[in-house]
Amino acid sequence: NSAKISYGELHQFTYLLNEPLLNKEGEVLQNTQTVHTQSYIFRNDGKEPATNVELIFNYAPMYLNVWPSRLFAEKSDSSRRYVMVFDYLAPKETIRCEVLAINTQIPMLLSVRCKEGVAQNMVLMPQKVFHPAFINSL
């Protein structure tokens, strides 16, 4: 009976924008732009709190959103990797992390761990939701 962190990638997408990238003088640098998004979910599936939950990215994301809104510390390790540290994740608590980058790649999520252990990666797939009446008739 301890903390058990799991995480997975909910989705990712690349938008191709038909908007030119301009320099300060208004000259076109690129005819189109790209916006990359990636969404992760983190969950404590255990029966005890997870403490010092660390999300380690290859480098700091251009834009980052955490939902529900949570306070976290930002650090970098000796290799200048970007580390987000959440002090606490309650049993059955879930947080999402959305990353966005414009005209550049999104940093890779390298590691997820907490004081109680290393997180387990879970593969997520879209699933059709059936009406309860249909399920109960089986």
Located regions from the model:
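Short, solvent-exposed beta-strand/turn "edge" segments of beta-rich domains on protein surfaces
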Residues: Y15-V35
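Short acidic, flexible loop segments centered on an aromatic residue
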Residues: A50-K75, C114-K115
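Intrinsically disordered, low-complexity Pro/Gly/Ser/Thr-rich segments with frequent PxxP/GP/PP motifs
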Residues: S69-Q105
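A general secondary-structure signal for short beta-strands and their flanking turns/coil
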Residues: Q33-T37, A50-N52, S79, T94-R96
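Preference for bulky hydrophobic residues occupying beta-strand positions
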Residues: Y40, L55-F57, M84, C97-V99, ...
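Asparagine-centered strand-capping/turn motif at beta-strand->loop junctions
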Residues: E27, H36, Y40-P49, E54-Y59
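Terminal connector regions
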Residues: S2-L22, P91, E98-L138
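Sterically constrained small-residue positions within well-ordered secondary structures
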Residues: N31-Q33, G46, Y88
